[in-house]
């Protein structure tokens, strides 16, 4: 890999395909450079981990219920379960799109540990970018000796 790369081919691939699978060296550092290049080209980047996402569609685009850590507290309703109250929050992608700056091209959902996503969840990420062109997805699928990327749709074939 060249010492200095501009990242233009990566940005073009993200803009063209919408969802990109990334393989980065395990020692790290490369993904930060590409995140910076995406920010400089006009995107807002949201970092997520694939572990614990649950229902990907609900987490990204719909209002969904969450429970904060209960810390041993009992439920106020008197059921006796140590589960706590349920709070409803908007989806991450929907909320970020509503608060997007005027000059921004859109948002990039940078998802680490993407190898835990099922095929159906990966297909949803591809269809999400096709349905809403302001949302782009970059999924880190694993490690490699050099930074490489390809459209996520090609990985599903």
UniProtKB/Swiss-Prot annotation:
One Gene Ontology term of the molecular function aspect: oxidoreductase activity, acting on NAD(P)H, quinone or similar compound as acceptor
Reaction(s) this enzyme catalyzes, per UniProt: a plastoquinone + NADH + (n+1) H(+)(in) = a plastoquinol + NAD(+) + n H(+)(out); a plastoquinone + NADPH + (n+1) H(+)(in) = a plastoquinol + NADP(+) + n H(+)(out)
Protein localization: Cellular thylakoid membrane
A single Gene Ontology CC term: plasma membrane-derived thylakoid membrane
Keywords: Membrane, NAD, NADP, Plastoquinone, Quinone, Thylakoid, Translocase, Transport
E.C. no: 7.1.1.-
InterPro entries noted in UniProt: NAD(P)H-quinone_OxRdtase_su_N
Membrane topology type: Peripheral membrane protein
PANTHER family noted in UniProt: NAD(P)H-QUINONE OXIDOREDUCTASE SUBUNIT N, CHLOROPLASTIC
Task of the protein: NDH-1 shuttles electrons from an unknown electron donor, via FMN and iron-sulfur (Fe-S) centers, to quinones in the respiratory and/or the photosynthetic chain. The immediate electron acceptor for the enzyme in this species is believed to be plastoquinone. Couples the redox reaction to proton translocation, and thus conserves the redox energy in a proton gradient. Cyanobacterial NDH-1 also plays a role in inorganic carbon-concentration.
Family per record: Belongs to the complex I NdhN subunit family.
HAMAP family xref list: NDH1_NDH1N
Quaternary structure annotation from Swiss-Prot or TrEMBL: NDH-1 can be composed of about 15 different subunits; different subcomplexes with different compositions have been identified which probably have different functions.
Name this polypeptide is given: NAD(P)H-quinone oxidoreductase subunit N
Recorded name of the encoding gene: ndhN
């Amino acid at each position: 890999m060249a010492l200095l790369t501009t990242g233009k081919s990566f940005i073009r691939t993200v803009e063209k395909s919408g969802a990109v699978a990334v393989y980065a060296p395990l020692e790290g550092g490369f993904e930060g450079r590409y995140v910076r290049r995406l920010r400089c080209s006009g995107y807002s980047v949201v970092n997520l981990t694939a572990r614990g996402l649950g229902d990907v569609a609900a987490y990204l685009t719909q209002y969904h219920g969450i429970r904060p850590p209960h810390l041993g507290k009992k439920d106020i309703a008197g059921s006796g379960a140590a589960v706590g109250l349920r709070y409803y929050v908007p989806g991450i992608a929907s909320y970020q799109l509503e608060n997007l700056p005027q000059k921004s091209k859109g948002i990039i959902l940078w998802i680490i540990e993407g190898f835990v996503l099922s095929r159906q969840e990966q297909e949803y990420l591809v269809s999400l970018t096709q349905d809403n062109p302001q949302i782009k997805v970059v999924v880190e699928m694993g490690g490699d000796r050099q930074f490489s990327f390809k459209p996520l749709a090609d990985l599903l074939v």
